[in-house]
């Protein structure tokens, strides 16, 4: 370490660096910048601000390649949330963020405060929150620990969202052993702008007052940002001070107080206190505004006695915000919050010099360059593997010829001379918790509060929310916002680039399946340690795939979150990384919600078609669709292997365009994309959603029948069409294909029936014959059965 007398400190540097998650190189860099050593409080501030959670030091160079501009983009990355222009004077703020590590330690509060934090990102921009979604990952539901994590997380999300009065309208949940002990909790929020001007976070106005509003500051959440930037270990279980405690009723008042304050026009800048608390809010506001901030901790409302400057600055107590307001308007603004029972005090002022100066007990305890804390932060350089890791190459060598033979009867297992018939296989897939109904989860959420939810969870491929006029909430509007979260983590684990492409493509396809036009993306990159060459390779390749897909599908990235070090220390000293999980949150706009389509069949006699990639045997034999990386492969053979198919993005774009045009023209009555589980599971899900049966006749195939039934990939959508519209839609597609020099297929599959049976024939031979009641029971009972049996055992 530095030995000059000018750099003497009154603390053990090595122990302090370990606690703050900093390296010796970081410490030397800090000293060089300051021309002195930092005191212990200042070192803590650098620890949180230079963590991956706050400054993206391992991922920033990769994120810079994302497309971030477009004709509808008003605010991109760098602010609390992205904002898009919806036309007709309406603007939407939206963002996704993670709360993974806190949820692993304290699932209820970790998930609840994750919801509270993402809501603050939205209303800090001047938007009223209108919807929540979540993307969750857990280990298998065969251990009390994983069941407890699921129950705690879902209860926390439900508690906060329900109490604050914002509907949780959609999401996705998947299960894999890699998430055991390290669940993923990603929360997404949407809000409609209520203010004329978008409220930004950059401070300005020398000597303008800085106002603290919201809850009091306590010792909860100490060092949460640093905690979120390291792996989970056994010691983390005792790190409960790093988990915050939220109050949704207080947040409800904060929403109203903020929107009222913003509408006065006297708020110059606003920043919520999330990760790193006061440290992050004041340093980011100063750095973004090119000014400084002086903060007097003696004026900050405290929840506990004898708090140190370190504790004040690193506390992550919830429901707090920092404002810069015009001089002379302090009381006017503060009264907006006091009437809601909230704290509101002037705690500082804007400085001309670009520094963060903190006073505690009448002494200056912090004097740091704002840019060094929040803008000019370190970037870790990693060598990118030139070739895929060896185990990935081995997976890519797999092909379908290694599987047992199949026939009309089912799969023939030679080793024990048994046949698993197609009915049994379908029921097994529908019982997979990742595929099965999530009703046990979403029934705990209030998804109808605010009375704007048009498509609720479990009904359509994306959530759909009515856009009401801000000035007149009683006036109906025909326009709506579609929203979805997606990530095929099994695909990403086997090919991060192709898996990330598929995540964007599927999210966009889901938006299109309800009739909405995809507009923009917010992403949540959940990965393991970037210091592991494989972990960094996965992150880099996934970012490349996301960028490619967003460019082609014209869905710019407006911001998001990076969550690294998602791995669990095992008793044997090894580490268990999660499957790489780049979650894509996407929003879209529909002009007429009355034309929106759901996934369930509508009427007996409607005809069922497969739109997009053909089921022609010649297509089945190419790389567009495959049994590699499928749910079928994992559930029936216990294999997670193969190389996922590559989505043809240009073809995908055209399929979605034709789908949306057909929905808008009322040519299609239902739409459901084919993804997890393949064609037959997609058909089954539409039967379950509607309660109606089907009789389908699929083409005979020379090679593998299971590929026809369960392959994944391609750009494929199941649609149902009234017999009266068959000629019109075929004629429309023919003209579309000619105009675009493309061959989008439209394969007839069968008919919707009212006999309540799920029947599929091959060359007039019935291979699948199940009652809709039977497949529904299997689908609906999967998660509750596992939870109940694990609790009992």
Swiss-Prot record:
InterPro entries for this protein: PRibForGlyAmidine_synth_PurL, PurL_linker, PurM-like_C_dom, PurM-like_C_sf, PurM-like_N, PurM-like_N_sf
Family membership noted in the UniProt record: Belongs to the FGAMS family.
Species for this entry: Prochlorococcus marinus (strain SARG / CCMP1375 / SS120)
Residues that bind substrate: 98-101, 120, 244, 316-318, 563
Involved pathway(s): Purine metabolism; IMP biosynthesis via de novo pathway; 5-amino-1-(5-phospho-D-ribosyl)imidazole from N(2)-formyl-N(1)-(5-phospho-D-ribosyl)glycinamide: step 1/2
GO biological process, one term: 'de novo' IMP biosynthetic process
Taxonomic placement: Bacteria, Bacillati, Cyanobacteriota, Cyanophyceae, Synechococcales
Domain of life where this protein originates: Bacteria
CC terms in the record's Gene Ontology section: cytoplasm
Protein name per its UniProtKB record: Phosphoribosylformylglycinamidine synthase subunit PurL
Reactions listed under catalytic activity: N(2)-formyl-N(1)-(5-phospho-beta-D-ribosyl)glycinamide + L-glutamine + ATP + H2O = 2-formamido-N(1)-(5-O-phospho-beta-D-ribosyl)acetamidine + L-glutamate + ADP + phosphate + H(+)
Physiological role: Part of the phosphoribosylformylglycinamidine synthase complex involved in the purines biosynthetic pathway. Catalyzes the ATP-dependent conversion of formylglycinamide ribonucleotide (FGAR) and glutamine to yield formylglycinamidine ribonucleotide (FGAM) and glutamate. The FGAM synthase complex is composed of three subunits. PurQ produces an ammonia molecule by converting glutamine to glutamate. PurL transfers the ammonia molecule to FGAR to form FGAM in an ATP-dependent manner.
Binding site for Mg(2+) 1: 97, 561
UniProt-annotated binding residues for ATP: 56, 95, 523, 560
Cellular compartment(s): Cytoplasm
Subunit comment: Monomer. Part of the FGAM synthase complex composed of 1 PurL, 1 PurQ and 2 PurS subunits.
């Amino acid at each position: 370490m530095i030995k000059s007398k000018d750099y003497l400190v009154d603390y053990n540097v090595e122990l302090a660096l370990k606690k703050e998650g900093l390296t010796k190189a970081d410490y030397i860099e800090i000293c060089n910048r300051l021309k002195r050593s930092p005191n212990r409080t200042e070192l803590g501030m650098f620890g949180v601000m230079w963590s991956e959670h706050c400054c993206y030091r391992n991922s920033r160079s990769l994120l810079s390649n994302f497309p971030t501009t477009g004709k509808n983009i008003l605010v991109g990355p760098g602010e609390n949330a992205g904002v898009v222009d919806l036309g007709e004077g309406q603007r939407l703020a939206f963002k996704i963020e993670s709360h993974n590590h806190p949820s692993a330690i304290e699932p209820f509060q970790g998930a609840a405060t994750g919801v509270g934090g993402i809501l603050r990102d939205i209303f800090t921009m001047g938007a009223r929150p209108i919807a929540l979604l979540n993307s969750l990952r857990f280990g298998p539901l065969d251990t009390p620990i994983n069941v407890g994590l699921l129950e705690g997380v879902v209860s926390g999300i439900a508690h906060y969202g329900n109490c604050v009065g914002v509907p949780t309208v959609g999401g996705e949940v998947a299960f894999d052993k890699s998430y055991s002990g390290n669940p993923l909790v990603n929360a997404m929020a949407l809000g409609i702008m209520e203010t004329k001007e978008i409220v930004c976070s950059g401070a300005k106005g020398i000597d303008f007052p800085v106002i603290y509003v919201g809850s009091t500051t306590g010792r909860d959440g100490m060092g949460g940002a640093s905690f979120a930037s390291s792996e989970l270990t056994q010691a983390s279980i005792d790190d409960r001070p790093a988990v915050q405690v939220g109050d949704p009723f207080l947040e409800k008042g904060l929403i109203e107080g903020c929107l009222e304050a913003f509408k006065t026009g006297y708020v110059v800048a606003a920043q919520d206190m999330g990760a790193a608390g006061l440290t992050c809010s004041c340093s980011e506001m100063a750095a973004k505004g090119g000014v400084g901030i002086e903060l007097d901790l003696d004026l900050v409302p405290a929840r506990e006695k004898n708090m140190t400057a370190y504790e004040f600055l690193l506390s992550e107590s919830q429901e707090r915000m920092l404002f810069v307001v015009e001089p002379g308007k302090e009381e006017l603004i503060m009264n907006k919050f006091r009437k809601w029972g909230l704290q509101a005090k002037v705690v500082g002022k804007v400085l001309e010099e670009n520094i963060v100066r903190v006073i505690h007990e009448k002494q200056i305890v912090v004097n740091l360059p704002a840019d060094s804390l929040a803008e000019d932060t370190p970037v870790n350089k990693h060598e990118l593997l030139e070739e895929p890791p060896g185990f990935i190459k081995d997976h890519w060598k797999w092909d379908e010829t290694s599987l047992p033979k199949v026939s009309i009867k089912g799969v023939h297992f030679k080793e024990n001379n048994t046949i698993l018939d197609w009915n049994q296989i379908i029921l097994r897939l529908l019982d997979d918790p990742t595929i099965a109904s999530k009703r046990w989860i979403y029934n705990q959420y209030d998804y109808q509060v605010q009375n704007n939810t048009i498509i609720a969870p479990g009904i359509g491929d994306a959530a759909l929310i009515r856009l009401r006029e801000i000035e007149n909430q009683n006036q109906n509007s025909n326009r709506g916002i579609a929203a979805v979260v997606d990530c095929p983590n099994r695909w990403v684990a086997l090919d991060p680039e192709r898996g990330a492409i598929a995540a964007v493509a599927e999210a966009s396809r889901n938006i299109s399946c309800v009739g909405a036009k995809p507009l923009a993306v917010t992403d949540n990159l959940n990965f393991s340690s970037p210091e592991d060459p494989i972990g960094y390779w996965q992150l880099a390749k996934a970012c490349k795939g996301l960028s490619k897909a967003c460019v082609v599908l014209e869905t710019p990235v407006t911001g998001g979150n990076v969550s690294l070090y998602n791995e669990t220390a095992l008793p044997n000293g090894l580490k268990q990384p999660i499957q790489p999980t780049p979650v894509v949150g996407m929003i879209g706009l529909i002009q007429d919600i009355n034309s929106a389509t759901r996934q369930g069949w509508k009427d007996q006699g409607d005809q069922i078609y497969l739109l997009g990639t053909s089921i022609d045997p010649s297509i089945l034999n190419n790389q567009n669709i495959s049994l590699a990386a499928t749910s079928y492969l994992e559930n029936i053979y216990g294999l997670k292997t193969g190389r996922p198919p590559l989505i043809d993005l240009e073809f995908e774009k055209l399929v979605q365009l034709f789908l949306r045009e057909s929905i808008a023209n009322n040519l299609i009555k239902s739409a459901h994309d084919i993804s997890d589980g393949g064609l037959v599971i997609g058909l089954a899900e539409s039967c379950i959603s509607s309660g109606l049966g089907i009789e389908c006749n699929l083409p005979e195939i020379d090679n593998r029948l299971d590929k026809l039934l369960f392959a994944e990939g391609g750009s494929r959508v199941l649609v149902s069409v009234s017999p009266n519209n068959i000629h019109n839609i075929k004629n429309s597609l023919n003209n579309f294909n000619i105009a675009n020099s493309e061959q989008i297929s439209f394969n007839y599959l069968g008919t919707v029936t009212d006999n309540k049976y799920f029947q599929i024939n091959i060359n007039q031979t019935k291979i699948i014959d199940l009652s809709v009641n039977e497949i529904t029971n299997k689908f609906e009972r999967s998660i509750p059965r596992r939870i109940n049996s694990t609790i009992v055992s």
